[in-house]
From Swiss-Prot:
Protein's UniProt name: Non-structural protein NS1
Top-level taxonomic group: Viruses
UniProt record similarity statement: Belongs to the orbivirus non-structural protein NS1 family.
Entry-linked InterPro entries: Orbi_NS1
One Pfam family cited in the UniProt record for this chain: Orbi_NS1
Length: 552
């Protein structure tokens, strides 16, 4: 391969096309209809390597360039390229896959340093909590910021606590007759008194040890108190509470409209659209007047998801009046996965997903109808059937497939997914790494990308493998800010032509090895043994970073 490319000075997109076609040629099925595939009676599409060797040995540049043109022409049909790649890579040959993975990992580690990703990792603050909580907009703790009142007075508390700067005010929901905006002038004095009293009685956060002022209040049902003593429950619920407060603090600012559209898919006219959507009188099948009241009056169980507001189900109710019953049923039965509920309980194969940020970056609509796939753990992403321009996405612990009509849209959609769900701290550290490489491979092979987009894709490959590897001082970079992360990925330096060619070869080889290994684990092929890659013992290159960090 390298001899052929260098001998005839093949570079750039033509070299990338030649590498790709060489890998899929053995399984390629050609109809020979155009007859341009036949060299001396041999189909070069099905015997590409033999034709390359013959053209090189015979020193026939005309035939060599024709081979390259055939490969480039084949790349125009990206759907066929993806299918042929998947077919070819899932049928492994006898080869040193482990060795190839190590070499690819070493090259990506070098690219991590040269691409500017390591410089950016140095600038990031240290991750305070290494157990990252994955938050998304499909669930919300927003109902708990609203103040429960009875006869115009705030309902008396039964217990108080705090999480960092947030006061937790526990009360009996049955004692309230309405819930109101916490910014209303008439209750500001009482609201401030609650903050001062919690700060006086509990000067240290029982969850984090934080000692400081209390600035906000969340009003929680007393039934929640015992579950907050469970570590995993408290860890997740507290983070959603913090996210709800951050959204609440944007009320009255320009960002409020973005938040409301992201959560509800529509923005009402007038002031304070967030409060309107939460407190608006709804025609619910129960006596509840608003979604806040419906949520707060219904207890969950030991699953933290069962206490939050299911935004996907809410949007179904907003779009179809008769589906408000689903909202009540979902909470009454304490479901934890909205996509499972829609797919299995309601036999709905699709749902609406909103991504305002991706819309702003690509110019496409923020609304997408997606196909609901399997729950995480039921099946791997490798067995998810992808057709035409589909790409995998994830809401909570459930996969879906969405249509991406351009390479830019596929790149940004995948980058957002990886930021939420993939934590790269070394080659083969967990299944998430395999999932990330597979999704990036789908983007690399299925869509036609520009050199700038492949440069961004390389940075994503580096992030998937090493983004969360410890720095020299043992700290882990904090990549939690999505906007900052996308700026680093999408606005980084563009690769030169030589760098682009080498990067493509590395990414392509890693994708090929990943698909080969994942299928080899499920099917036993004669003469092929997949390496036992467990716990990072076999192929973990992250340790090598400690020496590289010494330069900084």
């Amino acid at each position: 391969m390298e001899r052929f490319l260098r001998k005839y000075n093949i570079s750039g997109d033509y070299a990338n096309a030649t590498r790709t076609f060489l890998a899929i040629s053995p399984q390629w099925t050609c109809s020979h209809l155009k007859r341009n595939c036949l060299f001396n009676g041999m189909c070069v599409k099905q015997h590409f390597e033999r034709a390359m060797i013959a053209a090189t040995d015979a020193e026939e540049p005309a035939k060599a360039y024709k081979l390259v043109e055939l490969a480039k022409e084949a790349m125009y049909d990206r759907e066929t390229v993806w299918l042929q790649c998947f077919k070819s890579f899932s049928q492994p040959y006898e080869e040193d896959v482990e060795g190839k993975m190590k070499r690819c990992g070493a090259q990506l580690l070098e690219d991590y340093r040269k691409s500017g990703m390591m410089d950016e990792a140095v600038k990031q603050s240290a991750l305070v909590n290494s157990e990252r909580i994955r938050l998304d907009d499909s669930l919300s703790a927003m109902p708990y910021i609203y103040v429960p009142i009875n006869d115009g007075q705030i309902v008396n508390p039964t217990f108080i606590s705090r999480y960092r700067q947030i006061a937790y005010y526990f009360y009996n929901p049955d004692a309230a007759d309405d819930w109101i905006d916490p910014n209303l002038f008439g209750i500001r004095g009482q609201h401030n008194q609650i903050k001062r009293e919690v700060e006086r009685q509990i000067n240290t956060c029982p969850y984090t040890g934080y000692r400081g002022r209390v600035f906000q209040v969340m009003f929680l049902p007393i039934q929640l108190i015992n579950f907050l003593r469970m570590d995993d429950f408290a860890k997740h619920f507290n983070r959603y509470a913090s996210m709800a407060i951050q959204q609440y603090l944007r009320v009255g600012y320009a960002e409020e409209i973005r938040y409301v559209q992201q959560l509800f898919g529509r923005v009402p006219t007038g002031e304070f659209p967030l409060h309107q959507m939460m407190l608006m009188r709804r025609d619910l099948p129960t006596r509840d007047r608003s979604i806040v009241e419906a949520r707060v009056r219904r207890s969950g169980d030991e699953s933290w998801q069962s206490w939050l507001l299911p935004m996907i189900i809410i949007r179904e109710g907003l779009d179809h009046q008769d589906r408000w019953e689903w909202f009540i049923d979902y909470m009454d039965r304490k479901h934890t996965c909205q996509l499972c509920y829609l797919k299995h309980s309601k036999q709905i194969p699709t749902c609406s997903v909103i991504d305002v940020r991706a819309s702003e970056l690509t110019g496409c609509s923020p609304f997408k109808m997606v196909k609901i796939e399997e729950h995480v753990g039921n099946d791997s992403v490798f067995k998810t059937k992808l057709v035409r321009d589909e790409q995998i996405g994830r809401i909570g612990d459930h996969y879906y497939t969405t249509n991406c009509y351009t390479g830019a849209e596929a790149l940004i959609t995948t980058a957002i997914h990886i930021h939420h769900w993939i934590r790269g701290s070394g080659i083969w550290n967990d299944e998430g790494w395999q999932e990330g490489i597979f999704m990036l491979g789908r983007v690399l092979l299925r869509w036609e990308l520009t050199k700038a987009q492949r440069s961004a894709l390389l940075r994503l490959f580096c992030f998937v493998c090493y983004g969360y590897a410890p720095r020299a001082d043992g700290t882990i970079p904090d990549w939690n800010n999505l906007g900052n992360f996308l700026d680093i990925i999408l606005k980084g330096p563009e690769l030169s032509e030589d760098e682009d060619e080498r990067a493509y070869a590395t990414m392509f080889e890693m994708v090929r090895c990943i698909i080969t290994l994942c299928y080899a684990e499920k099917v036993h092929f004669a003469g092929f043994a997949a390496p036992a890659c467990e716990g990072g013992e076999v192929i973990n290159l992250a340790a090598a970073m400690s020496q590289m960090w010494m330069e900084y």
